[in-house]
Amino acid sequence: MGELLWSPTEEQKSQSEINKFKQYVEKEHGLFFPSYQELWTWSTTELASFWKSIATYFNIKFHSDFTTIVESPADPTSFIGTKWFAGATLNYAEHVFRNTTEKRPALIFQSEQQVKREVSWTELEFMVLKLQVYLKELGVQSGDRVAGVLINGIEAVALFLAVNSIGAVWSCCSPDFGEASIQDRFEQIEPKVLFANSNYYYNGRLFEKAESIKQLSLRLPSLLACVLIDDNIWEEILKMDLAQAELQFTAMPFDAPIWILYSSGTTGKPKAITHGVGGMLLEHMKALGLHQNVQDGDRFMWYSTTGWMMWNYALSALLMGNTLCIYDGATNYPDKLSLWKFAQESKVDHFGVGAAYLISCQDQDLRSLAYQPKTIGSTGSPLPPDVFEWLNLQFPKSQIVSLSGGTDVCSAFLSGCTLLDVYAGEIQCRTLGSKIEAFDEHGHHLYGEVGELVILAPMPCMPIYFWNDLANKKYFDSYFDKYSGVWSHGDWIKITAHDGIIMYGRSDATLNRGGVRIGTAEIYNVLNRTKGVLDSLVICVDHENGSSDMLLFVQLDNGLLNDALKGEIKRELRQQYSPRHVPDDIFQVSAIPYTLSGKKLELPIKKIFSGMTVEKAVSVDIMRNRESLLDFEAISKIWRRS
């Protein structure tokens, strides 16, 4: 068990959104839940009652009512085809703009090159109205796809809301994606319109995109129009005189598509993961309201690009009547405090980032900022215990909310709870409605032991389908081919004695040492604390004779890897964990390879060291730093000959 870091006060418990929801359910259903665990058990066994309670508690506006709440699919081997709120129609954007107020801004935006700008709710609504009129004039209809290659800015938010308001489907890539990577995504969905930034700044450098966007548009024959932000067409849209017009909302079936996200596409074409409008609306209000304690009037920020699902997740803070605070640019430009200063100056209540950024900030003393948000959120990779402890030292009054979920569900099914304590290295709880367990390889439940993260009941945030996935084959193979009738997520977890969760990394990157499986997060926990080591990556290469080699790669802050540092690393791994955690070889590399969404490329590196070519092992267009592969390719050739 990790160290107890934070406990909610009685006032925090009683005023929390999840406590208010618990009291609401108890009154409505004549029940009593003495603890969060009892509430969770009810929510995962009484699915219809729970999700109806979410809809009524958050006052979801249905244009037409539902006839049933949940209907199981005909095929019991998966959750594909589960029908939620049959007959219901609604609109996501309509739920955003019911929060319109002049008391606070809708958006606060800042980038590397622009001063902070506030956008009122009225200004945002008028911008969305103009974009809605333009899309309708083009002939965009419900179900059509509209795509963006956009920075995380005001325009991206307004465009999504306009697209959704007419029942069309949104899909977006970040402009730092490679041209082939963007084409691989958008050619699958055949968008009618493409919006894009002609340039953007990152780390103080200007990147021109106009020509590459032009070339992309020529390779997408479905396009009716391609609009660059700040070009003449965009300016004409914003100049429309619509003083007498009103924003209209198209009622959509509960399971109509809202947006299309994409798998990483590490080794092939990315899967086009399609989510339903009703599922996202209910799930995000539950996740933000109940599990991050996001309440009306708060200010919410999650640092993200538009190509990461956390952009969609953060957007839903607008559903909660929040001011959405947006920062676009490099996290360390001009220094590591840029994000923290923006959050402090913008009075952000809920500050969220990727775990890697928090790990990189450990050498900073942030107490001088005199900033204490309600919550500090982390996701993207496991947050090490020592980073929990550092955050607690810097922000003793803030609840640390570590999240885990994925693009697959566009949400977090492991998250926070203001009724519970925070322990170092642990996620507080399994979220309501998420029937998550840990399984061994035979499908047996595990408690207090490391196992595969599985979901035993459907959730409305699960994909409605993958775009152009005939007979749902890719969908089934992605989640249901390991355990019949059970969603296998691909993460390695342990459920603790007090029902917290410890993340151990991806199960497909698990290290097998003499039959004992080790999560990569344990290795990284030690390396993150090792002086002189900036970053690391570990793999296990299996051999035909049944043996294996654990290989550790380290990026140093300066100098060369020597025997003394190797010895220190091995000694710390042995002392803190076990002899099985000690690598067979340690190599120095210039950089650790990451995807654009911040994931370490463990599996592709394992494939390279197993003899696969770099070209077959990974699609470089999805990489943040493709040049980092050169060291791994060279080392693998030498290592395989030895």
Protein language model annotation of sequence segments:
Residues A225-L228, L537-D542, L551-L552, K570-S642:
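Conserved C-terminal "lid"/linker of ANL adenylate-forming enzymes
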Residues Q37-W42, A93, K103, L107-L161, ...:
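Conserved AMP-binding/adenylate-forming core of the ANL superfamily
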